[in-house]
Every structure is written in C-alpha cells, then in structure tokens.
Amino acid sequence: MSDSQREQRKNEHVEIAMSQKDALVSDFDKVRFVHHSIPSIDVSQVDMTSHTTKFDLAYPIYINAMTGGSDWTKQINEKLAIVARETGIAMAVGSTHAALRNPNMIETFSIVRKTNPKGTIFSNVGADVPVDKALQAVELLDAQALQIHVNSPQELVMPEGNREFASWMSNIESIVKRVDVPVIIKEVGFGMSKETLQALYDIGVNYVDVSGRGGTNFVDIENERRSNKDMNYLSQWGQSTVESLLESTEFQDRLNIFASGGLRTPLDAVKCLALGAKAIGMSRPFLNQVEQSGITNTVDYVESFIQHMKKIMTMLDAPNIERLRQADIVMSPELISWINQRGLHLNRK
C-alpha cells in the first residue's frame, strides 16, 4: 500500500467513525446503583486522582487513541492536544505506523507533544510492530506510556488487513520487556475475556484497556470500505465494555484495568470505575465535539463531564475511586447470566 493510500485510509476511518451513532441499547443500562439518601461527604471532598502502578492521572478520563497520519488528522490531533492541555486529562494518539514508515508523517503525531509539552501522552502501535519501532514510537512523543492495539476482527474485515496473528503474543512480550514506559494492551472495541487477560498477565503485562463493544465499531468501518460490504453480520462481534469489566474482576488486583468503548455519559464512566476500571477512555465523543463545536466548547464539555462525575460520586458517598468499588450495584438478569455461564467470581470490595 502506498503512503497516499494509507493517508486516505486514515481519513476514511475518521469520516466513518464520526458518522456512527451511539447504540440504542447499552449494557451500561443493565447496571444500576442503589441510591442511599444521605451522603456523608461534600462534592469538594471528592478526589478523582487515579493511582496506577507506574503513574497517576489527575482525572480518571483520557482522550483515547484515534488518529494521525494525514494532514487533516494532524489538525485534529492538535485540537485534541489543546483540549488535553487545558483540562489536565491524558491523551493517546492513533497508530503511529504511518510516521514510523514515512518521516513526512511524523509531525501529524509529534504536534501533540509540541502543543502539550507537560501533558500525559500515550503513543500507539500495533501488535506486530518490531521492538525497535515500538521504541521509536515512544521516543516520537516522549510518551509516558505505549498502547499496543490488538484488533484482529478489524484486520480480518479490512480489505487490505493483516491475516497473520501467530506471532502477536510473543511480540507483545518482547516489547513489554524492552520498552521502559508502561505498555497498555488495548482492544479496539471488541472487549477482552478472562483468558486473554490471563495470557497477558503471564507474559508480564501490567496495563490493559478492555475496550468493549458499543462505541466506535471498526467492523462497520472496514465493512464500509469493502466493495460489496459483505461482512456486516459481524457488527456485534465481541464483548461489551461491561461484560469485559466483569471478565476482568479476578485480575483487578494484579493488572491496571482501563475501560473504553461506548461510554455516553458521566454515569457510564462512574459505572466503569465502580466495576474496577482505574481510568476510562473516550474517542468519538471528543472527536465529534472538537470537529463540530470547536476547542473552547470541547474544553467546557470535558470540565462539565468531570464535575458531573464528582456529583455522582458524592451521591454514592465515594470520596475517591477506590471507595467507588464499594458502591451497591444491581445487575440485569442478562449480566447475571453472563457471570454464571462464564464462571466469574465478583470480588467487589
């Protein structure tokens, strides 16, 4: 594939992603908090700091991996970097493969660090990238962490996608051993199982983003790019974010669990934290906001989102993220069935 074709693909991904709509039915609606009438804390007492093994986040919310690799996506990355800088949230860039292949594309990613020199930034590569390229991806952004995206369904639906996955796990292990910053294994909207989490833990992974079904749908995106659009039947493939968090329960004391995929509201975000996530990522909401409403309105959106999360945590009598795990929750019969059929053991504190 030529560089111009790759650039076109990057733009197509963004265009199709922006046109996607939120799911009408979400597993977040199948999780409910029990309301207790009299909190013992004030909103001002809520501390939203997220403590992970290797770094802390001022807020448990970050702009998740989206884009880079074309002139248009450079502009998007710059806008999002301003939003991250002004609000104090972390930001991940999209796959840096374009920049690792073509030096002319480096600035479409490095603009993020240039715009936000003191911010927390995650770089991003695929699971098949050589170790030396993974090191370059970190250096490119002076990144605090490296996301490795695992996206086999997307690759298999993508007309020009990868068809070879046998080396992914061993390659991830090599990168984890060589890269000095934390490595976050990131799904792209298909969720993770307890078996995947066990396998990743066994090779030394400390961070995962379970990124479940319900948000940006890369099967649909790649199917739109197919000449006969013949793989739409896979559009609901994978686990939802809620199901993935339930799958992660027994690993939450051993792994730093991040969650993304289909979050619509501050309430959805708080539910993720209550189910064991240490931070939550969002992509399309930020993309749509910054492209349709501009930087200032997106900053306002983020600040409002954070304040709403604080208010919900106050209602739940949770002065910090750790205490959220003690919040009383009721789940739907469908989720209880998932728990039982999968043999999951919920050790909510």
Curated annotation (Swiss-Prot):
EC number, as in UniProt: 5.3.3.2
SUPFAM superfamilies documented for this protein: FMN-linked oxidoreductases (SSF51395)
InterPro entries attached to this UniProt entry: Aldolase_TIM, FMN-dep_DH, IPdP_isomerase
Thylakoid recorded as keyword: no
Principal location listed in the UniProt entry: cytoplasm
Sites where the protein binds substrate: R9, K10, S95, T96, H97, Q154
Keywords associated with the record: Cytoplasm, Flavoprotein, FMN, Isomerase, Isoprene biosynthesis, Magnesium, Metal-binding, NADP
Cofactor: FMN; NADPH; Mg(2+)
Catalytic activity: isopentenyl diphosphate = dimethylallyl diphosphate
Residues bound to FMN: A65, M66, T67, S95, N124, K186, S211, T216, G262, L263, R264, S283, R284
Alphabetized GO MF terms: FMN binding; isopentenyl-diphosphate delta-isomerase activity; magnesium ion binding; NADPH binding; oxidoreductase activity
GO CC annotation terms, alphabetical: cytoplasm
Subcellular location: Cytoplasm
Pfam families: FMN_dh
Binding residues annotated for Mg(2+), in chain numbering: E155
GO biological process: isoprenoid biosynthetic process
Gene3D superfamilies assigned to the protein according to its UniProt record, in alphabetical order: Aldolase class I
Range of residues in the leader sequence: none
Protein family: Belongs to the IPP isomerase type 2 family.
PANTHER family according to UniProt: ISOPENTENYL-DIPHOSPHATE DELTA-ISOMERASE
Quaternary structure and interacting proteins, as annotated: Homooctamer. Dimer of tetramers.
Role this protein plays: Involved in the biosynthesis of isoprenoids. Catalyzes the 1,3-allylic rearrangement of the homoallylic substrate isopentenyl (IPP) to its allylic isomer, dimethylallyl diphosphate (DMAPP).
Record protein name field: Isopentenyl-diphosphate delta-isomerase
The organism of origin for this protein: Staphylococcus epidermidis (strain ATCC 35984 / DSM 28319 / BCRC 17069 / CCUG 31568 / BM 3577 / RP62A)
